[in-house]
């Protein structure tokens, strides 16, 4: 049997997974944003029925790694939401090792890529469907290789944010196995 990439059944499987972990996802014909076929809309994901599975995973990853208290800021171009999140954090007196501070500085594109890979592996998808060769400026194959070798930089960011371990030890499994799928850490009540 030949595996087919980007089938409706696989896309539905990914969307169901995202909804189950708390990332709201819905179909919307013509949805498009920073990536073709997918739009981040105030912390939710709108997906065109023909969108690549890899795109759904990656854009969903951006929402999953963003702390829940800031997800609604993520809308369209993520950079504006991330800048606002950093501005808010700058007004607090949190120590850089505070869990929220650590989470905020670890939700960039490499972490989203590593998260998407882990989610795709969890769902049993082949590597060339999780990250396509023509993605990442044509470097998809190289990024896939780095992920397969567990040497991709985003893995370290996920570990720093608490999502996973870098290496197996003391009975803890390592990435791509995750301790949790969404960043739930919130603003401490004493933060100003």
Residue ranges with predicted function:
Residues 10, 53, 108:
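Hydrophobic (often cysteine-bearing) scaffold residues that line and stabilize catalytic clefts
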Residues 129-192:
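Pan-zinc metallopeptidase signature
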Residues 106-122:
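An active-site-proximal "capping" alpha-helix that borders the catalytic cofactor pocket
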Residues 1-27, 167-182:
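A metal-dependent hydrolase signature that marks the N-terminal structural subdomain at the beginning
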Residues 31-36, 66-108, 129-137:
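Post-HEXXH active-site segment of zinc metalloproteases
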């Amino acid at each position: 049997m030949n595996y087919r990439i980007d089938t409706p059944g696989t896309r539905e499987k990914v969307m169901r997974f995202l909804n189950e972990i708390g990332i709201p996802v819905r179909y919307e014909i013509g949805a498009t944003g920073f990536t073709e076929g997918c739009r981040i809309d105030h912390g939710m994901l709108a997906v065109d029925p023909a969108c690549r599975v890899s795109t759904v995973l990656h854009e969903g990853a951006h929402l999953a790694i963003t702390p829940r208290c800031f997800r609604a800021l993520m809308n369209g171009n993520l950079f504006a939401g991330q800048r606002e999140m950093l501005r808010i954090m700058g007004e607090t007196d949190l120590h850089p090792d505070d869990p929220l501070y650590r989470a905020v500085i670890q939700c960039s594109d490499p972490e989203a890529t590593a998260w998407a890979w882990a989610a795709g592996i969890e769902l049993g998808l082949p590597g060339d469907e999780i990250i396509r060769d023509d993605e990442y400026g044509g470097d998809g194959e190289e990024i896939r290789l780095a992920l397969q070798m567990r040497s991709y930089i985003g893995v370290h960011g996920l570990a720093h944010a608490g999502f996973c371990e870098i290496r197996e030890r003391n009975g803890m499994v390592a990435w791509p196995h995750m301790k949790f799928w969404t960043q739930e850490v919130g603003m401490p009540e004493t933060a100003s």
